Amino acid sequence: MTDQTTRLPVRRALISVSDKTGVVDFARELAALGVEILSTGGTFKLLREHGVDAVEVADYTGFPEMMDGRVKTLHPKIHGGILGRRDLDAAVMAEHGIQPIDLVAVNLYPFAATVARPGCTLAEAIENIDIGGPTMVRSAAKNHKDVAIVVNAADYAGVLESLKNGGLTYAQRFDLALRAFEHTAAYDGMIANYLGTIDQGAETLTTEGRAAFPRTFNSQFVKAQDMRYGENPHQQAAFYVETSPAEASVATARQLQGKELSYNNVADTDAALECVKSFVKPACVIVKHANPCGVAVVPEDEGGIRKAYDLAYATDSESAFGGIIAFNRELDGATARAIVERQFVEVIIAPSVSAEAREAVAAKANVRLLECGQWPAERADGLDFKRVNGGLLVQSRDIGMIAEADLKVVTRRAPTEREIHDLIFAWKVAKFVKSNAIVYARNRQTIGVGAGQMSRVNSARIAAIKAEHAGLEVAGAVMASDAFFPFRDGIDNAAKAGITAVIQPGGSMRDNEVIAAADEAGMAMVFTGMRHFRH
């Protein structure tokens, strides 16, 4: 059994990096510890320019770099020195003049950055597929019993500290090896994803000409947290995050206080945060079981998020119990105090949290308080996934949204300016409600939400019931539907409840009947031409 604590010193290191962050200082410290340094190409030149003594690999092997740098380190003196087992292969290594290499510091050609450049050709992408680098990384990782592999500049300091204390333990080398295999797996996955979108044989194809989805799908996520259980107590669970998230999200959020996030907390917080991101003016979203149960938008000069919270809570105070609350502005002390004094809440998330708000929430030690950072005004493209038994559904994110100019009035009466504002508000909310989704809204406040019903008319009925139960007036309110009305009954029910304007995608075979129902009731109706199913 391998000794987990015995420290192995480093006498010879090979350094060959594309990302040269911190490499000069790292090499200088190694040299100061008496480590002989081998290096290649640009890395060798950089070290020599900064006065770090190093031996160029071409001089060490007696073979020059060739083929425009395609062949640098693919030589038995390099790979024998890395792969050679010190206890079994010493005689063979000595016979062939192969010196052991105890540490390999390598990172790879910037393939992802290359293919992300507009106009990148297939030929350019191919030349940025690293061969020697991954080979050395995998060799060193395989032989981690005797060799340390470093693929991330963030690990330089820790490695140096260990070497100053006598060497790296087996446990450290094993961890570095695991990171190395994770690194090469992600790298190869990127290459496979890219090439899988290429029209075969198109040597001059650019990034813009690629298919939307590759032949095989490769993605890497890093475990951020083991969870007590999953959606239910009998299920095991963990939370994995992207290696480089594109924008502020629940995955990037910093927990300031409270109990550990549960599986359902993460899912519901994501739903709340993604919904509140839809609004430019100060907004509050309250979510329960992944559905918005209260949403409001209030301009800063009319009360901002403090007032928005009151209105969102008023939509459905029963469902808000034990919910998730998200804001698109800094959480202030007054709003935080109102929350903790009024209701039981699982999670509060905002771009930032004031010191006064932190103090207020601290009175409820179990409340999970998250700070996620600010997101850009333009939503980033990305992919959504849904696991099915034996497969994976992949689609582009639903970041589609409409503006007033996109609305098509289909009834005799056009909506008023107030109705238009409320229609667009309700439409943004409906996008985040489970289908079939109906949202009643008035003055940029939800007054009733009907979610997840198998028939659209029942979602409309539930929205009306919710509004009545909350004591909120429906007369003069608007209605949003995430998909078209297949029959006129949803419009008839809304008219009876007092709805005066409707927003929906349109596209039903019975659109004319639905429009006629709206005209009979004196309602305004607009089509968006965009559906927002959410399953």
UniProtKB/Swiss-Prot annotation:
Belongs to the PurH family. Signal peptide: none annotated. Gene3D superfamilies: 3.40.140.20, Methylglyoxal synthase-like domain. NCBIfam families: PRK00881.1 (NF002049), purH (TIGR00355). Residues 6-151 form the MGS-like domain. The gene is purH. GO terms for biological process: 'de novo' IMP biosynthetic process. Pfam families: AICARFT_IMPCHas, MGS. It catalyses: (6R)-10-formyltetrahydrofolate + 5-amino-1-(5-phospho-beta-D-ribosyl)imidazole-4-carboxamide = 5-formamido-1-(5-phospho-D-ribosyl)imidazole-4-carboxamide + (6S)-5,6,7,8-tetrahydrofolate; IMP + H2O = 5-formamido-1-(5-phospho-D-ribosyl)imidazole-4-carboxamide. GO terms for molecular function: IMP cyclohydrolase activity; phosphoribosylaminoimidazolecarboxamide formyltransferase activity. Coiled coil: none annotated. This is Bifunctional purine biosynthesis protein PurH. It comes from the Bacteria. The keyword ATP-binding does not apply. Pathway: Purine metabolism; IMP biosynthesis via de novo pathway; 5-formamido-1-(5-phospho-D-ribosyl)imidazole-4-carboxamide from 5-amino-1-(5-phospho-D-ribosyl)imidazole-4-carboxamide (10-formyl THF route): step 1/1; Purine metabolism; IMP biosynthesis via de novo pathway; IMP from 5-formamido-1-(5-phospho-D-ribosyl)imidazole-4-carboxamide: step 1/1. GO terms for cellular component: cytosol. Its EC number is 2.1.2.3, 3.5.4.10. Keywords: Hydrolase, Multifunctional enzyme, Purine biosynthesis, Transferase. The IMP cyclohydrolase activity resides in the N-terminal region.
